[in-house]
Regions:
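Catalytic-core segment of enzymes that process non-peptidic bonds
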Residues: 1-36, 87-130
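Active-site catalytic loop in hydrolytic enzyme cores
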Residues: 1-58, 62-80, 84
Length: 216
């Protein structure tokens, strides 16, 4: 849904006719219900939240997440978002990140740091940051997760969510690709449109009207 704009010149599936109801599939398997979101999608809590509401117990992140935002201090967004998404959705996270250094892309590098996080946000296993292939292994106790989801009263953010209070979800922000060629310049123009839209305060009535809400 969220290419790494402006540099990734791709459309979201729903820009080209995909049904939004099909964009966050969850596979029911013998080892649990598994969903997947890619790279930049993880910086948007709505993506993994939708996976959770679609039944995901394990969320897989496939990523080429680079420094200076990557898996090393002082920013370490990689760890920050992996742990946060696990805790706020009460689900396991299996996050695989590219570990590579490319001389043609200074100052960027892909620091690896693949990890497995439990449903309380605890890191169960993590690869040391750096280039090269590494294998990360940890137990994923789906039975414990299911029991915790049933038992928990406090901090059950999925059950406590007040969706009706967040009017921004009904108001378009970043404009769709449309029929124009997607390139970096076009993405930058759409970013400016999105910034203007994000500055507009949304009341419940305005948001409902923009989303095709009820008439009088």
């Amino acid at each position: 849904v969220n290419p790494w704009i402006p540099w990734e010149v791709h459309a979201s599936p729903h820009d080209v006719g995909a049904d939004p109801a099909t964009m966050f599939p969850v596979a029911q398997t013998e080892i649990g219900n598994i969903g997947c979101a890619t790279c930049y999608d993880w910086l948007f809590p709505e993506a993994t939240r939708q996976l959770a509401f679609n039944g995901a117990e394990v969320a897989v992140r496939v990523s080429a997440y680079m420094d200076p935002w990557g898996a090393t201090p002082p920013m370490d967004w990689w760890t920050l978002f992996n742990r946060t998404r696990a805790a706020e959705n009460t689900m396991f996270v299996v996050a695989a990140n590219q570990g590579a250094q490319m001389t043609g892309y200074p100052p960027f590098s892909w620091p690896g740091g693949s990890m497995i996080v439990d449903f309380d946000g605890r890191i169960l296993a993590q690869a040391d940051p750096g280039p090269g292939e590494k294998v990360v292994v940890a137990p994923i106790d789906i039975g414990a997760l299911r029991a915790e989801r049933e038992r928990r009263r406090g901090h059950d953010m999925r059950a406590h969510l007040r969706t009706e209070a967040y009017t921004y979800l009904n108001a378009p922000i970043f404009p769709p690709a449309g029929k124009t060629v997607i390139d970096i310049d076009g993405n930058n123009r759409r970013i400016q449109e999105g910034r203007r839209a994000a500055k507009k305060p949304q009341t419940p009535n305005q948001a409902g009207n923009q989303a095709g809400g009820k008439g009088g």
